[in-house]
Amino acid sequence: MTTRYKLTMAYDGHLFHGFQIQPNQRTVQGVIEEALKKMTKGKRVVVHGSGRTDAGVHAKGQVIHFDYPGKEIPAKNMMLALNALMPIDTVFFESEIVDEDFHVQYSTKGKWYRYVVDQHRFTDPFNRFYTGHYPYPLDISLMKQAAKDLIGEHDFTSFAASGGQIVDKVRTIYYVNITPDPDKKQIIFDFIGNGFLYNMVRILVGTLLEIGNKKRPVDDIPRVLKAKDRQEVRTTAPASGLYLQQVFYEDIPKKYRLDLKKD
C-alpha cells in the first residue's frame, strides 16, 4: 500500500543540472529521491514534477508528487522530514495527501513563469545567477504593446527551441505583464498560460527585448507566429533569470484571464 503526497517547493537552480534526474548530474529530482531513499531504507520512490526546469532555472512554486510505501505519515510530518534531509538550496513549504488519480503534470490548469532582467551597465556579481543581464536601452511601452499580441491561443512553433518532443505547439497565454523596478534597475516579465514549450518563455523574453531595443518592429509578433519557424526568432534569454512561480490546479483567477478581455 502506498500514499500519494503532493508537495510544493522552492529551489535555487544555479547549482542544479535541471529538475529531471540524469546520470552523474546533480538534479532536483535526484536530491529528492535520495532523501526519500533514506526514509525508506534504500527503496527508490519515483518523484514526478509539474515540469522539467532546465539547468540554472529557479522555482518558487514547483509541485511534485510521489507514492510513499508503508505506513501513512501525516502530510506536515512528511514535509518536515524531507526538509531535514534536503540540501539548503531547496525547501518544501506546502504538503498534502492526495487521491491516486491526482498527477502533478496532467492535473494542471496552468503555470506562471517570471523572468527577471537586470539593466545595470555591468553584470551584478551578486545577482548574476538570478537575473538575465541586458544593459541596453529599452522602451517599456513598445514591449507592453507587443506583448498584447501573445495573448490568446496560438501555435507557438516559432517560439519553441529544437529538441522538444511535443508535436502539438498550440498553447494559450492568459496573461503577460511587464513591470519595471527602477530602484533595482530590473524589469519583471510575467507569463501565465495553460502550458509552455521548451525554452518558450526565454525565447519570448528575448524577442520582447529586441522589440524594446528597437531591433525588431513592435508589430512583428503576429508575423512570427504565422511563420511557424524557429529561425524567425533566434534570441533566447539566459536561464538564470527564469523562475517557475506557481502551478495552478484550480481555474486561473479571472484577474489573470486577459484572453477573455481581448477583442
Swiss-Prot record:
EC main group = isomerase
This entry's Gene Ontology molecular function terms read: RNA binding; tRNA pseudouridine(38-40) synthase activity
Which sites bind substrate? 113
Give TM regions: none
Q: List its EC numbers.
A: 5.4.99.12
Protein's job: Formation of pseudouridine at positions 38, 39 and 40 in the anticodon stem and loop of transfer RNAs.
Name of the protein described by the UniProt record: tRNA pseudouridine synthase A
Protein source organism:
Lactobacillus johnsonii (strain CNCM I-12250 / La1 / NCC 533)
